[in-house]
Amino acid sequence: SLAKAMYRSYHRYMADYCSADPRRLKGLLLAPGADPQWAADTIRQHADEEWLSAVWPVLPEGLPVDDPDLEPIWQAMDEADLPIMHHSFFYEAPYFPGYRDIWGNVAVARTAAHVWGAQRLMAYVLVSGMLDRYPNLRVATVETGHGWLPHWIIRLTSQIDYVKGAVPADLKHTPMEYVQMGRVFCAIEQHEGPEMTKAVIDILGDGVLMYESDFPHPECYYPDSTDNVISWGPVIGEEALRKLMAGNAARYLRLLSDPWDGSRDGNGRSGNGR
């Protein structure tokens, strides 16, 4: 089909783009939820390629991330140690949850769109038992902000106790416990600043947040984006800064070699030990 041909073309493009130095240049694979078995086969086809570091599940509107039909995708990802990466959308498909209810103000809609898309996916991953069934799975949201995450995790943790019948009876951990286990990650947005970032670290720990530049989009602080975040060190702490700038991403992403190793034949695995 045309859709599958476009997916294949994208993956060839990513492999070619990253081939300049696949130790340092990484990409993600698109896994269409409309055809889970084809998506799983595609993951296995590319699983040993060094450029591949994460998978973006592309879900048709109305299909929840915990739908049983998607299990082949999670199985293939778990086998390859590939994490889930989520990026929300706004005015283009797949539209954000509630996109029909914006009341006409684009600024308000865009403020809500990326966050709510991330919140919904994160919540369903955490309360569905997916992380229990697939012990290598990790999940992250990117370009969705980060200040919302502690409130969402705390509230979600309380709600699965308040509405016990809404989650699997054999769910092994609470959302907060999955965070503390190193299964949840979130990329920062620089406009939220060092104080907000410190608050997230104080509540959830320093193993969650990851640096993000948003290059080459308009929200990037280019050419000062890296120096801008490094300057937050006195506020968030130097150890937390090191993890934010590199360590947490190295744990989250599937890395088949050490990006900081000068050799081209390294066999090191990602920092999470898997």
Roles of regions detected by a PLM:
Residues 1, 110-114, 232-233:
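Short coil/turn segments at secondary-structure junctions
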Residues 1-2, 37:
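Surface-exposed, active-site-proximal loop segments in enzymatic domains
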Residues 3, 7:
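Acidic, glycine-rich flexible loop segments
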Residues 18, 22-24, 31, 37, ...:
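Catalytic pocket-lining loop regions of alpha/beta-barrel enzymes
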Residues 32, 214:
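Conserved PLP-binding active-site segment of the aspartate aminotransferase-like
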